[in-house]
């Protein structure tokens, strides 16, 4: 049974995209009225090793917008995380497919982080791993661009999980 108000952001290794998405989403939810501002956000990776440090470029990209993720360590996506979430927000279709192939029964509350943007050129957020800082900043900006439509979706979701 889902715990009302828990959201999981998912990428591959949980060291670049999903920690940035987690921090950005926490920041956005904190500015919302209850119940959204009390919702919990965690991140995980479909191929993560537990305890890996967050990418330095992810730390720098978020520091530039006033968010600190330097203490983040990776965790693998688990059945418990999925079962306790009202929404699992993936960075790519391949992450969604991997979850659908890995977990039985297949969770139905899996979405792309940018899925709710009606005019987005791409619904996916590419992996900046190993790239220069500007690629991490572009990744961050794609997430920031998705936040307003994601907030609208989460408001609708909140009204259903009361």
Residue ranges and their predicted role:
Residues 18, 92-93:
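Helix N-cap/beta->alpha junction signal
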Residues 9, 89-90:
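Hydrophobic beta-strand core positions in alpha/beta domains
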Residues 2-84, 152-161:
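Conserved active-site segments centered on acidic
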Residues 4, 87, 93-162:
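Phosphate-binding/catalytic loops
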């Amino acid at each position: 049974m889902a715990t009302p108000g828990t959201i999981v952001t998912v990428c591959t290794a949980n060291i670049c995209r999903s920690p940035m998405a987690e921090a950005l989403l926490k920041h956005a939810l904190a500015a919302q009225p209850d119940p959204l501002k009390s919702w919990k956000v965690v991140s995980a990776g479909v191929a993560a090793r537990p305890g890996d440090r967050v990418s330095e470029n992810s730390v720098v990209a978020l520091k530039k917008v006033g968010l600190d993720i330097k203490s983040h360590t990776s965790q693998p996506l688990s059945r418990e995380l999925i079962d306790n979430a009202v929404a699992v927000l993936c960075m790519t279709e391949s992450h969604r497919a991997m979850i659908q192939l890995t977990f039985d029964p297949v969770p139905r509350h899996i979405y792309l982080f940018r899925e709710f943007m009606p005019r987005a050129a791409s619904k996916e957020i590419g992996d900046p791993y190993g790239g220069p800082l500007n690629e991490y900043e572009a990744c961050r900006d794609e997430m920031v661009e998705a936040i307003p439509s994601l907030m609208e979706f989460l408001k609708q979701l909140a009204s259903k999980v009361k």
